[in-house]
Amino acid sequence: MNASNAGSWNAVAALAVSEKSEAEVEYHLNQLKISNGFDPSGEIKLKNLTESSYLQFIENLAGLNIVVFSTATDAGLNTIDRVIAHQKGQVTEILRHIDKMKYEGGRQGVQLVSFQLAKLLPQLYVQLLCQVNLMFDIVSRVINYYAQREPEALANFRWRIDQKNISRTDFEDAFEKLSPVLLQTRSISEPLMMVKGFDYRGLSQYKFEDGKVPGYLNKVYGIEAKSGLNIQKIIRGDIQFLDSKDSKGIQAVDLIVSGIRRCLRRQFSDNEKAASKLGQLMLQEKNNAPPLSLISFADDQPLPLEVARLVRIMMEKNKSMFLRT
């Protein structure tokens, strides 16, 4: 995820779909294929579609009770030195409280994870960081979205991730080993927001049992937690890497993320219209932040004005987090 020119945006994305909406997503995907002369049972890519049919597809999806999350980074600004510096900082963060851990086994486990993270190639580290950021973003926002609209959908989290190769990739191996620790570290510094009056009963299987909340939260971080969600169980309970040809959901999100990438690179004939349509799939972020996460390893580089305008359009069109009464 590094390139020679600024503006070389890459992105990852996820589509949150409840069981009730799965058939509707598949229907609109099939209609898109048919309208462009393709067999519904096959795969299509954004390059095979007319711009008008693609944006109509996005508009059709926006009318469903589904949400898109995305993390994007400008590969042209991700120099090797900047990525390595960020990587070292993440390793330091993981090791920060290792001396306070009670059990030797736990300390050894953290040391092993930090070693594995430190030896990742920069490109793989960027890919892993974007994917972990995406998954944390999903959990931190999708729960409150569905707790208001379709609380029963929270009973089961099933993650289906695009498998790029038939054989197990270095990324899949790194993701399985390292993402739980990175997610855990993030959840401590950014606790999930729960809103009084929302219906969280569907999350019962993901809650720590009484008295089972990890004691290190209080001993190490000073957090007095009497209850909480087991983030690792939410993520790892049902996760599979699948070939996109076997998953209509993965095919749909592949088209969506391709559109986000093309829009940020300003390669649509009407980028503002594309930003407006894509923004309708996204979910409002707190503190008036963009609905998609923008990761930069170059803090001294402001977002280009043209891209900033497109992101603002997405913000203006995104789905509201809270139901209007």
Summary of predicted features, one role per range:
Residues 2-325:
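Phosphate-ester processing/binding pockets and catalytic centers
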